[in-house]
Amino acid sequence: MMPSDHAAAKTADEGERMTQAREADTPLHDTPVEVRNASGGGPFLLVCEHASNFIPPEYGMLGLDDAALESHIAWDPGALAVADEMARLLDAPLVAARVSRLVYDCNRPPESPSAMPAESEIYRIPGNAGLTAGQRQARTQAVYHPFRAALTTAIDAHGARRGPPAIVTVHSFTPVWR
C-alpha cells in the first residue's frame, strides 16, 4: 500500500468511527487533545488542530445534521491520517485536537469570535449562536486550555531532548469553499 492509499484508508476509518460515535450518542474521546509518538526523536513537532469532527454529547451536535458534521466546516478531513503518517515517517511527536473546531477552534485564541463561530461557510451553527461569556469561558477551559497545555508540554519535552522543534501544522482544504 502506498502512503497516500494508507492515509485515505485511515481517513475513511476515522469518518466512520466519528459517525458511529454520534449515532451511538457516546463520547468517542474522553480528552480534547491527544499526543502521539510523544518521545519522537526527529527535529519536527506536528500539530493537527482540526483532526476531529467529534462533538461531545453535551453540545447536542450544535444543532447540525450529519452532513454538516462530515463536511469541512467541522474538521479537516484526512488531516489526521496525513499527520499520523508524517509522524511515523519523521519520528515526530504529534499533538492533535480530538474535538471539532466548531466546539472550539484550537487554532484561534479565546478572544477571537471565530474560536466558536456562529456561522461557517454556508452553515449557521445554532449551538454557537448567542453564547454567553460564561459559556465561551467554559469551552475555553474544556478544550483550548488542555490543548495549549499539551502543546506547550510537547514543545518543552522536545526542547529538552534535542532543542527547539520545527513546528509543522497539518490541515486539509476543500476543493470548493462555499
How would you describe each model-predicted region?
Residues M2-H6, D13-I167, S172-R178:
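N-terminal catalytic or cofactor-binding beta/alpha core of small enzyme domains
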